[in-house]
Each structure stands twice: as C-alpha cells, then as structure tokens.
C-alpha cells in the first residue's frame, strides 16, 4: 500500500512538472477561444465586425509562429466552428481577410489541420 502511495505521488509530481512544459509546446484552445470571443456575433448572427474581433485575430496570428502552434490553432478553430450550428461559413472563411490578416489555411468545419505549415 505504501508503495502505491509513493508511486501515485511520483506520477502526480511528474504531471505537475511536465504539464507546463507540454502546454507551452502549442497554443491552447482556451487562448484561441479567448482571442476570438469578440467575433461570435459577427460569425453567428451576421452582426457587425467588432474592432475587438480583429484585434483578437491579429493577436492569435502573432502567437501562432511555429507549425505546431498553427496546427493547434487550426484544430481549435475547427472544433469551435463545429460547435456553432449557426456559424456563417462564408464569414468564418473570410474573417482573416476582413481583419487584414493572412493565415495559411481557410477557417472551416472541414479544414485539414495536418496540412497547415
């Protein structure tokens, strides 16, 4: 029993130490969602394009500098797109351009994020 407790403590300690290292390898979906929260009305209710939305798009683009970060951001965007049944696909695909940002893939529910470089 004591060995099991020690093993559990060791595993927990490794998770605590390695967790932040693994998290820094790519953007989190929380970061992606947080940066794009101001875009929801524009993308789902045909509202106006808020300045805060474009600020978030620009920030996200600036954070996604490596291939793993861009692929992770893409996966988060695809997941978010699939969670909104009222998503305007044309507005989602055109969002980066509307904000003056160039990203290397189209935002859609079916983007193959493994091909993003």
UniProtKB/Swiss-Prot annotation:
One Pfam entry name: Tryp_alpha_amyl
Domain of life: Eukaryota
Signal peptide: 1-25
Disulfide bonds: 29-76, 39-53, 54-99, 74-113
Alphabetized GO MF terms: lipid binding
Keyword Signal: yes
Any single biological process term in GO: lipid transport
Keywords per UniProt: Disulfide bond, Lipid-binding, Signal, Transport
InterPro entries xref list: Bifun_inhib/LTP/seed_sf (IPR036312), Bifunc_inhib/LTP/seed_store (IPR016140), Plant_nsLTP (IPR000528)
Keyword Disulfide bond: yes
Family listed: Belongs to the plant LTP family.
Role noted for this protein: Plant non-specific lipid-transfer proteins transfer phospholipids as well as galactolipids across membranes. May play a role in wax or cutin deposition in the cell walls of expanding epidermal cells and certain secretory tissues.
Protein name, per record: Non-specific lipid-transfer protein B
Native organism: Brassica oleracea var. italica
Lineage: Eukaryota, Viridiplantae, Streptophyta, Embryophyta, Tracheophyta
Gene that this sequence comes from: WAX9B
């Amino acid at each position: 029993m004591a060995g099991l407790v020690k093993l559990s403590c060791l595993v927990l300690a490794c998770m605590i130490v390695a967790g932040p290292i693994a998290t820094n390898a790519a953007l989190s979906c929380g970061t992606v969602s947080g940066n794009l929260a101001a875009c929801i009305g524009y993308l789902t209710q045909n509202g106006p394009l808020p300045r805060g939305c474009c600020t978030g798009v620009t920030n996200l683009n600036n954070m996604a500098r490596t291939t793993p970060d861009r692929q992770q951001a893409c996966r988060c965007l695809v997941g978010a797109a699939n969670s909104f049944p009222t998503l305007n696909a044309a507005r989602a695909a055109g969002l980066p351009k509307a904000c003056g940002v160039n990203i290397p893939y189209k935002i859609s529910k079916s983007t193959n994020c493994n091909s993003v470089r």
